[in-house]
């Protein structure tokens, strides 16, 4: 193989852990792992380590969990490791300019979109919601901007009509490690060819919110169906019935026009709950009332048919 590089890995969630796993099998030398501090989780709010920390400790790697990399003493942790390159995957902390310049080959990031489209925090969800035909991963050289660095390598995959953010996440978690290992080989060999991002093609993937996931019936049925897939598994699209939130897991578009006001229930049977939208009809197929498990519309109608009387309007 190419030169074995001294690598610092920085990441936090499962998506990052899958990249660390690929690095551990690549023959490179992982000299340190940075991940976010343990966070309260679950009903008991017990402090839980990140997936990256669990994996790193299992492999006996040194783990660092600073709250910030701005303090000089935390930057010194990076400097002392004398890395050739720092690999950053969904770390969640800002890397100051001083840290970016410490490794011999700089810092590289695995981003879940085909840059310069969808810079920012939620590229997977935004690409789905926008109706993009494809997405992918970009390995880029990091600079002080938000996903503005030169691109080193890209891999793409189609977005299907059945994809959710969950399934796309898994696809990109397969592509990312492939692109990362190839990029590291090119950096080690001196064959990497950085490409400047075209600023005229930039779009931004803003962070998601639960309120944003509330179904807006004035949108088209096609937009709402994509929204439902984009927000699955988090934060989940939802509507309000009798003052309680009801999550929507799955829906389809019925290619028929209607003059009914957006939000009006047109039909409610075992084939689905058909609702008028700003353009077209959305057919709700799987839903989850508060405190219950996700269920088919047929099961929901058996217990809550009074919620879905044709002619009534959903909020």
UniProtKB/Swiss-Prot annotation:
CDD domains: FMT_core_Met-tRNA-FMT_N (cd08646), Met_tRNA_FMT_C (cd08704). (6S)-5,6,7,8-tetrahydrofolate binds at residues 113-116. One of its GO terms (cellular component) is cytosol. It catalyses: L-methionyl-tRNA(fMet) + (6R)-10-formyltetrahydrofolate = N-formyl-L-methionyl-tRNA(fMet) + (6S)-5,6,7,8-tetrahydrofolate + H(+). Keywords: Protein biosynthesis, Transferase. It comes from the Bacteria. This is Methionyl-tRNA formyltransferase.
């Amino acid at each position: 193989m190419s030169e074995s590089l001294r690598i610092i890995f920085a990441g936090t969630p499962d998506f990052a852990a899958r990249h660390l796993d690929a690095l551990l099998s690549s023959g490179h030398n992982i000299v340190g792992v940075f991940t976010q501090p343990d966070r309260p989780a679950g009903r008991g709010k017990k402090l839980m380590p990140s997936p990256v920390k669990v994996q790193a400790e299992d492999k006996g790697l040194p783990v660092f969990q600073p709250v910030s990399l701005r303090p000089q003493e935390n930057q010194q942790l990076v400097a002392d490791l004398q890395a050739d390159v720092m690999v950053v995957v969904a770390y969640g902390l800002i890397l100051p300019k001083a840290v970016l310049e410490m490794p011999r080959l700089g810092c590289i990031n695995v981003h879940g979109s085909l840059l310069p489209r969808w810079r920012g925090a939620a590229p997977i969800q935004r690409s789905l919601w926008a109706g993009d035909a494809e997405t992918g991963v970009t390995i880029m050289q990091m600079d002080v901007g938000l996903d503005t660095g030169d691109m080193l390598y890209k891999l793409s995959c189609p977005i299907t009509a059945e994809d959710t953010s969950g399934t796309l996440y898994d696809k990109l978690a397969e592509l990312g490690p492939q692109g990362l290992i190839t990029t590291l080989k090119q950096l080690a060999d001196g064959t990497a060819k950085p490409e400047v991002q075209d600023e005229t093609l930039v779009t931004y993937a803003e962070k998601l919110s639960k309120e944003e996931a509330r179904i807006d019936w004035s949108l088209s049925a096609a937009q709402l169906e994509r929204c439902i897939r984009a927000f699955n598994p988090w934060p989940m699209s939802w509507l309000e019935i009798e003052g309680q939130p009801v999550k929507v897991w799955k829906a389809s578009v019925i290619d028929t026009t209607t003059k009914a006001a957006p939000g009006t229930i047109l039909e409610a049977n075992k084939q689905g709950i058909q609702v008028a939208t700003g353009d077209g009809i959305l057919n709700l197929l799987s839903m989850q009332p508060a405190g219950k498990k996700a269920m088919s519309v047929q099961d929901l109608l058996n217990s809550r048919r009074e919620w879905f009387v044709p002619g009534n309007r959903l909020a």
